């Protein structure tokens, strides 16, 4: 064979695009090409692997069709976490970004337990990651090291969310949401709950109905939705929320909530019913009523908000025990199941549009 013939033979690609894709797929599966990292450009890959640019391009497109990588404008192909298989021990991560307030511990405990149950039914594991006191880079590195296959996050911190998404990890917001969010979210149906509670009180003949809760001004969307539901429920019943009977303060401040509740119920023209649609606020309203000698059900009606018990657990009595007329009830188990379902869908098709899913609520009358 002449030197010219030898050169021509050596320039012909010796591998197909499918073979190159197999090699890259194996490296992604083993984690040597980590989620969030970028592959070499088509030209660099062709040169490294001694294949034509066309072969490299076809291999990359094949991996993209399998949702193992995604093309990003002017940056190249980023590795996704789809190769981090939960059936092979890669965990789902629950990133708790906001430390639980004293009144919210039951929420976080219920949600973590529900996620563990939902993952366990599929034979999967759950990794809990606390954000408090840790830089974002440390949280992201923990997810990378564990090869998390998806992340359930409770935060509205856009910097944290973007850092996790850059790993190629599917992200679902759990009971957190903001307008134009690039992430899927699963939330309690606060609007429907507010409507149910307000309509129930109006149906019992109440006309002086108070609202006790977080200040909706500048609040997150879930606070605004619950407040708006209460206003809408009254409007459907031909009533309006009296500004003079609207007691709002900062969420997570039990002392401020206690002051608001006591001031509301100690006035000469006190309300005959109170919408306290957060556990902490319902607790303080019930305490204030008790200290003022008012009996719930006789002197006023009080509607709160609570979680339904896990299967096999004792029946829930809510934030204020039996001292409530009714409660809006939602299921952490349903929220957890929908979060995992959405992660599975996102893993299968990373290009789906972001969605907002609402967990149904119901009104339960006490006593």
Task: Name each model feature, range by range.
Residues 93-94, 147-155, 210-213, 268-281, ...:
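Periplasmic-binding protein-like
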Residues 18-22, 30, 42, 84-141, ...:
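Amphipathic helical "hinge" segments at domain boundaries
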Residues 31, 66-67:
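Glycine-centered, phosphate/nucleic-acid-interacting loop/turn motifs that mediate DNA/RNA or nucleotide
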Residues 98-110, 128-136, 186-196, 212-262, ...:
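Hinge/beta->alpha junction and helix N-cap segments in small-molecule ligand-binding domains
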Residues 155-196, 280, 306-325:
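Flexible loop/hinge segments that line or gate small-molecule binding clefts
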Residues 1-54, 58-61, 84-85, 356:
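Extreme N-terminal segment that seeds HTH/winged-HTH DNA-binding domains in transcriptional regulators
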């Amino acid at each position: 064979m002449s030197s010219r013939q030898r050169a021509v033979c050596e320039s012909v690609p010796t591998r197909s695009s499918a073979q190159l894709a197999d090699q890259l797929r194996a490296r992604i599966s083993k984690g040597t090409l980590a989620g969030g990292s970028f592959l070499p450009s088509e030209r660099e890959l062709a040169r490294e692997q001694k294949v034509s640019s066309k072969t490299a391009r076809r291999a990359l497109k094949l991996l993209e069709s399998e949702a193992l990588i995604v093309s990003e404008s002017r940056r190249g192909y980023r590795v996704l976490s789809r190769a981090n298989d939960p059936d092979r021990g890669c965990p789902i991560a629950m990133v708790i970004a906001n430390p639980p307030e004293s009144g919210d511990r039951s929420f976080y405990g219920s949600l973590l337990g529900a996620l563990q149950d939902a993952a366990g039914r599929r034979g999967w594991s759950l990794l809990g990651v606390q954000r408090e006191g840790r830089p974002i880079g440390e949280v992201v590195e923990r997810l990378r090291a564990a090869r998390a296959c998806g992340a359930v996050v409770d935060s509205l911190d856009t910097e944290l969310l973007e850092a996790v998404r850059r790993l190629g990890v599917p992200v679902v917001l759990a009971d957190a949401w903001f307008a134009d969010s690039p992430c899927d979210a699963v939330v309690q149906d606060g609007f429907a709950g507010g409507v149910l509670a307000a309509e129930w009180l109006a149906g019992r003949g109440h006309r002086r109905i108070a609202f006790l809760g977080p200040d909706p001004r500048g609040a997150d969307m879930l606070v605004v939705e619950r407040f708006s539901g209460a206003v809408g429920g009254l409007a459907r019943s031909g009533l309006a929320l009296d500004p003079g009977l609207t007691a709002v303060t900062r969420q997570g401040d039990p002392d401020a909530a206690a002051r608001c509740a006591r001031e509301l119920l100690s006035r000469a023209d006190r309300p005959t019913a109170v919408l306290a649609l957060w556990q902490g606020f319902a607790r303080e309203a019930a305490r204030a009523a008790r200290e003022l000698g008012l009996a719930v059900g006789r002197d006023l009606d009080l509607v709160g908000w609570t979680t339904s018990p896990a299967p096999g657990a004792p029946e829930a009595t809510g934030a204020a025990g039996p001292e409530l007329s009714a409660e809006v009830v939602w299921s952490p188990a349903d929220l957890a199941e929908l979060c995992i379902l959405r992660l599975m869908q996102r893993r299968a098709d990373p290009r789906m549009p972001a969605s907002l899913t609402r967990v149904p609520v119901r009104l339960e009358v006490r006593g």
